[in-house]
Amino acid sequence: MAQSAERPRPYAFMTANATRPVRTRFAPSPTGFLHLGGARTALFSWAFARHHQGVFVLRIEDTDVERSTPEAVQAILDSMDWLGMQPDEGPFYQMKRMDRYAEVLAGMLEAGTAYHCYCSPEEVDAMREAARAKGLKPRYDGTWRPEPGKTLPPVPADRKPVIRFRNPIDGATSWNDMVKGPISFDNGELDDLIIARPDGTPTYNFCVVVDDWDMGITHVLRGDDHVNNTPRQINILRALGATLPEYGHVPMILGPDGEKLSKRHGAVNVMEYDAQGYLPEAMVNYLARLGWSHGDDELFTREQLVEWFDTRHLSKSASQWDPKKLNWVNAHYIKGMDDAELAGRVAPRVERRGGKPQAADLPAIMGLLKDRAETLEQLAEDAMLFCGEYQPAPAELAAQHLTETARAALADFAARARDTEWNRAAISALIKAVLADRGLKMPQLGIPLRVAVTGRAQTPAVDAVLELLGKETVLARLQAL
């Protein structure tokens, strides 16, 4: 498993011109399940690291103490494990790194790149309102920002300060985004960010910077809702004398209606797709194709994803979630899976339905059913025909199909079947013989056979169904008519 020490090993940053080993990270907040957008971001970071023989780091950003839960952490770990994205290092927990953040904050205060601000929230709100009234961008006005020759206000005796980062005023902060291309922010538009609260706890943007610095992160792939955070984080990294990572911001995933993907579009929790019977191989394939492409290839293995992955082929526009396309991809992986392996994945789902997969030839059943299935849940439900308790046909269905003519043909079939070898070819030949001798067409015997033996009018090929049920079971059910 991954390295789990809470303080990563020191990382020796190289010069900007030197080649650094690739180190990516996924840094979720454990305030709920891992959603599809987060899973896709993690997948891109994982694939990029694997492609470059680099290191994929998992960091748990758990500083929101009220909302972060151990259950949410476990849900994230379970989701990543299910998708096959095991980290090389971590998980690291921000709450266990508070001493390190305090150390860096103290150093910044000493260096003059951060300062104490004693403004109350109400005073800052008033500053912003005053700026709006003048048609300016609402922001903190720098009251407590140290400047040469500036006299600061008296320190209030009854107020604990926040710590603000002394953001550059002149110039611009720019980077060449791996997804969006060149992006630039005027430093004059960025106010002095709060990096520690009055109780001393560090804020999100500060923790992220220190973590990326300490962990030697070279490439940051994340959602484009973080674009506005990036210039602030870059400026803090520069103030610390750190080598900057490269940044890439991936557009969001939209629902089928073009709106932001949400619960109203269906499942957004990764593990719900496991419960619904989607294969992790299919989810990885489909998620990767949402916002990344390799020519016209729609289907590819995890190994091919790693081999082909390139940030130059990440889309600049939002991707649209398509449940039908996911079903198509999942069906492809189900059809291509070895019958025995597929049986192993379906067996627990059959058992949850009260079936007995061990009492049937489940691999052979998978071979019969898998070409029609889109999910493992559908396979498990269909397999209950062979593994579940037999339910005779409802009276209405029996009355419709088990006529006197049908019952006579079924009795003839049963009598001949006793001395017939029990395999699909022999059963098919027997059905044809009964049809020919009685002048019947296939539906006149095939449907009554299904209804009598399975309790259903629709099943896969009747000869295959009878073979898998076994001669003894088939004859016993026909005898009971």
Swiss-Prot record:
Q: Where does ATP bind?
A: 263
Matching entries from PROSITE patterns are given as: AA_TRNA_LIGASE_I
- Per the record, what are the reactions this protein catalyses? tRNA(Glu) + L-glutamate + ATP = L-glutamyl-tRNA(Glu) + AMP + diphosphate
Which Gene3D superfamilies does this chain map to? 1.10.10.350, HUPs
Q: Which domain of life is it from?
A: Bacteria
Enzyme Commission number(s): 6.1.1.17
Region annotated Disordered sits at 139-159
Q: What is this protein called?
A: Glutamate--tRNA ligase
Tell me the organism. Answer: Bordetella bronchiseptica (strain ATCC BAA-588 / NCTC 13252 / RB50) (Alcaligenes bronchisepticus)
